[in-house]
Regions:
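Interfacial juxtamembrane loops and adjacent helix segments
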Residues: 276, 287-324
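Alpha-solenoid helical repeat scaffolds
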Residues: 471-475, 505-510, 539-544, 574-580
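Alpha-helical transmembrane segments of multi-pass inner-membrane proteins
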Residues: 4, 8-24, 42-55, 77-89, ...
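Internal/C-terminal transmembrane anchor helices
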Residues: 234-251, 408-434
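Flexible juxtamembrane loops connecting transmembrane helices in multi-pass membrane enzymes
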Residues: 148, 214-218, 236, 244-281, ...
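TPR/TPR-like (Sel1-like) alpha-helical repeat modules
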Residues: 530-534, 543-574
Length: 609
C-alpha cells in the first residue's frame, strides 16, 4: 500500500478492477486476438454489479457523492432504478444477471461519478492502450485479407472504437515522446504515422454509421470554436444543405427515397419498434426483454430483405431501444441524464475545456451519434467506454457543494451496505462462473477427438449448471441434435424457452424436430405452429405441420396448411421442386435467393424484388 498510496485512498482500484474484469468479457480475446472464438464470461451486467458491490463496500464515499448530487439527478437515477428493478421483480423469468444488464446504464456512470479523480486519470490512458491493441489486431486482419473485426467483433463497431481511441493513442504517444525529450521534428512524423495508419484502417472498415458520427461530431466542435456570427452562418449553411438535400431526395426521377426504403433495414426496425412502444408506452417491456417481445412485431417484408436475421436484439437506435425497454418514463430519465451534462458543456463553450477533456467529449459524441444507427451502447467495449465517459460529465453537471462532511453514517447502515455488497459479489461470481462454463462447453464439444458420450455428458452438466445461458445453450441444443440425442436437444430447447428470451432464434423449430424424433407428434405440432408464427415467411415449419398432420391422421388440417405454404412460396419465389433442397439446407429458408441457378434459383439477391 505504501508503494501505491492512491490505489485505495483515491479509489484507483475501481477503474482498474472494472477494466480488468471487462477484459474477460471474452477470454479468447486475450489468447487469440486475431481470430477469437466466442466465449462469453463477464457481461456488462456483471461489471455493473461489481461496481455496485465495490461502491457499497466504500459506503461513506458513495453516500457522500450521491448526497452532493442535484435533486433532479437523484430523481432521474431513482426513477430509472425503480423501473428497471420493477421489471426484475415482476418478471419471474429474469435471472440475477438480467437485473445487472438493466441497471448497468446507471451503475457504471455512477461509479465514474463517485470515483471521478480515479476515472479521470485512468480512462484516457486505458483508451490509448485499447487503441493500440485494436489497431494492432485490425492491422493484422487487414493485411491478411480478413474482415476487419478488431477486438470489437464487428467492422462497424470496430470503426467507431478506432475513432474514439486513436486520438488518445496519438495524444499520449506525443506526451511520451516529449517526456523523453524527442525533438519535435522526430516526434511529429511518428505520431502522424500512427494516426494516419489508424485512419487508413478506419476508412477500410467502410462504416457509414461511424462516418456520420464523425461528421456530426466535427460540426459540433466547429460550432463550439466559432464566434456567435460564425455559428449563425454555420446554421444558415446547414439549413441550406438540408433544404437542397430534401429537394433532391423527393425530386422527380431521383429515386433516392425509394432506394433507401428498399435497402435500409433500419427503417423496418424503427417502424416495428414504434409498434412495440405503442403497446407498452409507460414502463416498457424490460431492460433485457426487447428481443423476446420484438419477434411479434417483425413485419413480413423484413424477411424478404437480404440482411434479415433470425434474431433482433436491438432496433439499431438507442432512443427507440430505451423507450421500448424502459418506457417513455424511463427514457425521459435517461435522456435527462445524458443531455443535461452535454448542454452544460456546450453552454460553457470550448474555451473552458482542456485538450484531454475535448478528446473525452469527442469520444462520447461519436459513440452517442453512432448509437442512433447501431448497437454501440450495448456492444463491448463501446458500451463500457460510453457509460464511463458519461459519468465523468455528470461530475460537472450534477455535483453541488460537498455535503458529505456533514453527513453521519450509522454503523448499521455501513453493515447493511457491506452485507449487500457481499451478496451481490457472490451472485455475480456465480453468474460469471455459469457463463464461462457454458461457453467453454459449447466450444469444447466441437473437438473431434472427444468421444460422443463425453460430449453428451458435458452438455447435460452444462444445462443443469447454467440453464439461463441462452447463447451457449442454443449451440448445445444444435449439437445435441446432431449427435443423435433428441432428449438432450429437447432439454436444451426447454431451457431456452424457460428463459427470459422464450422466442430465441428458431428454438421452437428445433424443439419440434426433437419431439418428432421422440414420437411426441402433438407437442411437435404445437412447436412448429409457434415457429411458423414467429417467422411468417419460413417454409420449413409449415411443411412440417403438413407432414405431422398426414402422419397423425388429421387430413382436415392439410388444405389450410398447404394454402399457407404456397402463399409463402409465392412471396419468396420458391417452386415445389426446391422444397427438398430447402429442407436439406435450412439456410435457403431464410435466404431462398441464394438457391443456385442449377436448382432453379436466382443465385443471389435480386436488385429488384
Amino acid at each position: 500500500m505504501a508503494l501505491f498510496p492512491g490505489f485505495f485512498r483515491k479509489g484507483w482500484y475501481m477503474p482498474a478492477g472494472l477494466s480488468a474484469a471487462a477484459l474477460f468479457y471474452n477470454p479468447e480475446l486475450l489468447l487469440h486476438s486475431v481470430k477469437p472464438q466466442y466465449m462469453l464470461a463477464v457481461s456488462a451486467g456483471s461489471v455493473g454489479f461489481l461496481a455496485l458491490a465495490l461502491m457499497l463496500f466504500d459506503f461513506r464515499r458513495l453516500a457522500g457523492a450521491v448526497a452532493s448530487m442535484k435533486r433532479e439527478a437523484q430523481l432521474a437515477l431513482g426513477g430509472f432504478f425503480c423501473i428497471a428493478a420493477g421489471h426484475f421483480f415482476l418478471n419471474g423469468r429474469y435471472p440475477f444477471d438480467a437485473l445487472g444488464e438493466s441497471l448497468v446504464w446507471i451503475l457504471l456512470p455512477l461509479a465514474a461519478y463517485v470515483y471521478y479523480d480515479a476515472f479521470r486519470f485512468f480512462l484516457p490512458r486505458a483508451l490509448a492502450l485499447l487503441g493500440l491493441w485494436d489497431l494492432a489486431v485490425s492491422g493484422i486482419q487487414y493485411h491478411s485479407g480478413a474482415m476487419i473485426f478488431g477486438i470489437a467483433g464487428n467492422t462497424n463497431w470496430n470503426a467507431v472504437l478506432l475513432l474514439v481511441s486513436l486520438p488518445f493513442l496519438a495524444w499520449h504517444l506525443s506526451g511520451l515522446l516529449r517526456r523523453f525529450r524527442f525533438p519535435a521534428l522526430a516526434s511529429l512524423p511518428a505520431v502522424g504515422a500512427v494516426l494516419g495508419y489508424g485512419l487508413w484502417i478506419f476508412a477500410a472498415c467502410a462504416s457509414r454509421g461511424a462516418a456520420v458520427a464523425l461528421g456530426l461530431t466535427g460540426l459540433i466542435f466547429l460550432a463550439m470554436h466559432l464566434t456567435s456570427r460564425g455559428q449563425r452562418y454555420l446554421r444558415y449553411a446547414l439549413l441550406a444543405v438540408l433544404l437542397l438535400g430534401t429537394l433532391y431526395m423527393i425530386g422527380p426521377g431521383s429515386g433516392f427515397a425509394r432506394r433507401i426504403a428498399e435497402q435500409e433495414d433500419r427503417l423496418v426496425f424503427y417502424r416495428a419498434t414504434l409498434g412495440l412502444i405503442a403497446e407498452n408506452p409507460v414502463f416498457g417491456v424490460g431492460g433485457v426483454s426487447f428481443e423476446n417481445e420484438f419477434v411479434r412485431f417483425k413485419p413480413e417484408d423484413y424477411f424478404t430483405r437480404m440482411q434479415n436475421a433470425p434474431r433482433t436484439n436491438h432496433p439499431h437506435n438507442d432512443v427507440l431501444f430505451m423507450m421500448a425497454s424502459f418506457g417513455i418514463l424511463g427514457w425521459l430519465a435517461w435522456a435527462w441524464l445524458v443531455l443535461y451534462p452535454l448542454y452544460g458543456i456546450f453552454r460553457g463553450g470550448a474555451g473552458r475545456l482542456s485538450g484531454e477533456r475535448k478528446l473525452l467529449l469527442f469520444a462520447f459524441l461519436c459513440l452517442l451519434f453512432h448509437a442512433q444507427l447501431d448497437l454501440i451502447f450495448v456492444a463491448w467495449p463501446m458500451n463500457l467506454i460510453a457509460l464511463w465517459l458519461l459519468g465523468l460529465f455528470w461530475r460537472d453537471a450534477f455535483r453541488e457543494e460537498q455535503v458529505s462532511a456533514g453527513l453521519r453514517h450509522p454503523a448499521i447502515c455501513r453493515m447493511i451496505a457491506c452485507t449487500a455488497g457481499i451478496v451481490i459479489l457472490f451472485w455475480t461470481a456465480l453468474s460469471v462462473a455459469r457463463s464461462a462454463y457454458a461457453s467453454s462447453t459449447a466450444n469444447a464439444i466441437h473437438d473431434p477427438a472427444m468421444r460422443v458420450s463425453e460430449k453428451l455428458e458435458r452438455i447435460s452438466r452444462s444445462l443443469r449448471f447454467a440453464p439461463h445461458e441462452y447463447k451457449p445453450n442454443y449451440a448445445l441444443m444444435i449439437a445435441a441434435g446432431k449427435l443423435g440425442a433428441p432428449e438432450l436437444a429437447l432439454a436444451a430447447a426447454d431451457a431456452l424457452i424457460g428463459s427470459y428470451i422464450e422466442n430465441y432464434a428458431h428454438v421452437y423449430g428445433y424443439r419440434g424436430g426433437a419431439l418428432v424424433k421422440l414420437g411426441r407428434y402433438d407437442e411437435a405440432f404445437e412447436a412448429y405452429l409457434k415457429e411458423a408464427e414467429n417467422y411468417p415467411l419460413s417454409m420449413i415449419p409449415v411443411y412440417n405441420l403438413a407432414s405431422i398432420s398426414k402422419l397423425t391422421g388429421h387430413p382436415e388440417r392439410i388444405p389450410k396448411i398447404e394454402e399457407e405454404l404456397f402463399r409463402r412460396m409465392k412471396i419468396q419465389n420458391v417452386t415445389p421442386a426446391q422444397i427438398p433442397l430447402i429442407l436439406k439446407n435450412p439456410d435457403y429458408d431464410r435466404a431462398p435467393w441464394d438457391i443456385p441457378v442449377k436448382y432453379g434459383g436466382s443465385g443471389g439477391y435480386p436488385k429488384k424484388r
